[in-house]
UniProtKB/Swiss-Prot annotation:
Belongs to the aldehyde dehydrogenase family. The record marks E248 as: Seems to be a necessary countercharge to the potassium cations. SUPFAM superfamilies: ALDH-like. The gene is betB. The modification Cysteine sulfenic acid (-SOH) is found at C286. InterPro entries: Ald_DH/histidinol_DH (IPR016161), Ald_DH_C (IPR016163), Ald_DH_CS_CYS (IPR016160), Ald_DH_CS_GLU (IPR029510), Ald_DH_N (IPR016162), Aldehyde_DH_dom (IPR015590), BADH (IPR011264). Its cofactor is K(+). It is an enzyme of class 1 (oxidoreductase). Involved in the biosynthesis of the osmoprotectant glycine betaine. Catalyzes the irreversible oxidation of betaine aldehyde to the corresponding acid. Disulfide bonds: none annotated. It comes from Escherichia coli O6:K15:H31 (strain 536 / UPEC). K(+) 2 binds at L246, K457, G460. Dimer of dimers. One of its GO terms (molecular function) is betaine-aldehyde dehydrogenase (NAD+) activity. This is Betaine aldehyde dehydrogenase.
């Protein structure tokens, strides 16, 4: 693909040049080619985006629930019509295989938007009787202008996960995509405008997180920030949001999630689940189950089943429909993952497979890392304690149920957890003791629109998806009505 035209900001229903004069490049990680130069939003751009959003939000919130619902449903239709085009752009920008982006990224994002479009008429208040002559009623009102700050691993899906409930509740959103993968969020803005969203209700500001993102979190005109990213960045976002104007926050942060295989599990099923929990999207999924706990007596058999499945991974041209494994999102991220792999070797973990870059035709110019499995791991190893966010699995052995629950919970993270077992009683008994916000039994990774997702501990605050997220983008107003004559004590 030839280099794209310089990408601008999207404010008030159209493209506009950044006033900052700063730009950055977005790179195709499969081959190192520059896809586009992208303009970066500065403080003045944030100010005008907020002013635009405030204007648009008043128009949007004044529409009826059904009017808003119809506009968002039109956006869903356009997303599905343009699925293949958007998936190709997502593949170029992220490096993910087209077989994945064309069936998951846009599809699941559109599903979330359709879900919230259908929920809009359900936003309602309540009536509370006090006495014969007085009652209280409540209203759910939008927050106003909110900000979304996205991560680089699921660019358009995250933009939809954040914008769908925000817009459904009557808010306007200013969205800052990751500077690593900024392109499809701009296309989403086009689609919202085409569907009939009032100008200003969805503005997109590409830029560097430490600048554009910080301006958004500090701006007094923004009522809430929804952030997806790493724990360290999330803490800064939360601190800035609170210090500036006590903004509400939703934080979807990192994870180091446990996958527990019990001794009664079907090891074929367990190996399939472990592969999906570690190598889907080349391991760049926040919920990945990278700490795989296996009974000591099952370790050798389990390792052989994992090795057999790694042999079946197809890393190749990302647009080949048979390819199911792509490069990492960027060269700096590849280098970071390689540092973790080197640390694992240094600390005594045994490399079962992988452990280096992929080499040869089609790989040498890209950010490719081989699917890597470490075994003979211990809980104190760096690769077991820290989030790597790459195709790196760590296998650990255990002896008892109580032991594995304790060790699974021995982490600052609490995003996800899963177990594989044939015992239904054990499944629920154990899952109820795991300190994680998203849990799976005999499966892994699905996050449907109806399912609230979010973490415990350092893995986040608040939830995305589900009914409760729609409500989190509203504020409750209570109104007392008195029908009898008011009695003053003065």
């Amino acid at each position: 693909m030839s280099r794209m035209a310089e990408q601008q900001l999207y404010i008030h229903g159209g493209y506009t040049s950044a006033t900052s004069g700063h730009t950055f490049e977005t790179i195709n990680p499969a081959n190192g080619n520059v896809l586009a130069t992208v303009q970066a939003a500065g403080r003045e751009d944030v100010d005008r985006a907020v002013k635009s959003a405030q204007q648009g939000q008043k128009i949007w919130a004044a529409m009826t629930a059904m009017e808003r619902s119809r506009i968002l449903r039109r956006a869903v239709d356009i997303l599905r019509e343009r699925n293949d085009e958007l998936a190709k752009l997502e593949t170029l920008d992220t490096g993910k295989a087209y077989s994945e982006t064309s069936t998951v990224d846009i599809v699941t994002g559109a599903d979330v938007l359709e879900y919230y479009a259908g929920l809009i008429p359900s936003l309602e208040g309540s009536q509370i009787p006090l006495r014969e002559t007085s009652f209280v009623y409540t209203r759910r009102e939008p927050l106003g202008v909110v900000a979304g700050i996205g991560a680089w691993n699921y660019p358009i899906q995250i933009a939809l996960w954040k914008s769908a409930p925000a817009l459904a509740a009557g808010n306007a959103m200013i969205f800052k995509p990751s500077e690593v993968t900024p392109l499809t969020a701009l296309k989403l803005a086009e689609i919202y405008s085409e569907a009939g969203l009032p100008d200003g209700v969805f503005n997109v500001l590409p830029g560097v997180g430490a600048e554009t993102g910080q301006y958004l979190t500090e701006h007094p005109g923004i009522a809430k920030v929804s952030f997806t990213g790493g724990v360290a960045s999330g803490k800064k976002v939360m601190a800035n949001s609170a210090a500036s104007s006590l903004k509400e926050v939703t934080m979807e942060l990192g994870g180091k999630s446990p996958l527990i295989v019990f001794d009664d599990a079907d090891l074929e099923l367990a190996a399939d689940i472990a592969m999906m929990a570690n190598f889907f999207s080349s391991g760049q999924v926040c919920t990945n189950g990278t700490r795989v706990f296996v009974p000591a007596k099952c370790k050798a058999a389990f390792e052989q089943k994992i090795l057999a499945r790694v042999e079946r991974i197809r890393a190749d041209d990302v647009f080949d429909p048979q390819t199911n494994f792509g490069p990492l999102v960027s060269f700096p991220h590849r280098d970071n993952v390689l540092r973790y792999i080197a640390k694992g070797k240094e600390e005594g973990a045994r490399v079962l497979c992988g452990g280096d870059v992929l080499k040869g035709d089609g790989f040498d110019n890209g950010a490719w890392v081989a699917p890597t499995v470490f075994t003979d791991c211990s809980d104190d190893m760096t690769i077991v304690r820290e989030e790597i966010f790459g195709p790196v699995m760590s296998i650990l052995i255990y002896e008892s149920e109580d032991e594995v629950i304790r060790r699974a919970n021995d982490t600052d993270y609490g995003l996800a957890a899963g177990i594989v077992t044939a015992d239904l009683n054990r499944a629920h008994r154990v899952i109820h003791q795991l300190e994680a916000g998203i849990c799976w039994i005999n499966t892994w990774g699905e996050s449907p629109a109806e399912m609230p997702v979010g973490g415990y501990k350092h893995s986040g605050i608040g939830r995305e998806n589900g009914v409760m997220t729609l409500q989190s983008y509203t504020q409750v107003k209570s109104i007392q009505v008195e029908m009898a004559k008011f009695q003053s004590i003065f």
